[in-house]
């Protein structure tokens, strides 16, 4: 379903009409991050609004990346750190996406990182599409509409 929404595949029947908007897909591997870059370099890559260096570092700090973390390779980050960095990068980018699609965002996150993710999502004012089995998390981010998919089992 995500690939249909993003336009990566077309439906076998019917038509999907997509508005001209910017969507960001945050998969379980955080593939928007470049593992060859260091934390600060990654944040700088998202700097479309030409924030000054100190402003980027303030944002990194607000997502719990201290000065000691700025030279750490993105490939060495834990799942929670990768999620925090990606959320930080989205706040650095001047062109906030119209839609953010999360695929199982709480997988491999500890309680502190789930709280940071929840706070960031609750501040976001645009459209969210969240694929998740974590009902507690979905309640905390005040999902307005749900689509529940169940697999049919045949015997």
Please describe what each predicted stretch is.
Residues 1-155:
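ABC ATP-binding cassette signature C-motif
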């Amino acid at each position: 379903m995500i690939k249909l929404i993003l336009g990566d595949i077309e439906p076998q029947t019917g038509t999907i009409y997509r508005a001209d908007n910017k969507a960001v897909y945050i998969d379980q591997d955080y593939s928007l991050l470049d593992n060859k870059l260091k934390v600060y370099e990654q944040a700088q890559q998202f700097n479309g609004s030409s924030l000054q260096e100190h402003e980027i570092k303030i944002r990194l700090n607000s997502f719990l990346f201290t000065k000691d973390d700025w030279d750490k390779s993105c490939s060495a980050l834990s799942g929670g750190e990768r999620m925090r960095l990606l959320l930080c990068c989205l706040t650095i980018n001047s062109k906030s996406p119209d839609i953010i699609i999360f695929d199982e965002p709480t997988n491999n996150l500890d309680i502190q990182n789930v709280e940071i993710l929840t706070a960031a999502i609750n501040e976001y004012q645009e459209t969210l599409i969240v694929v998740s089995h974590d009902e507690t998390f979905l309640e905390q981010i005040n999902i307005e509409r749900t689509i529940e998919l169940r697999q049919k089992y045949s015997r």
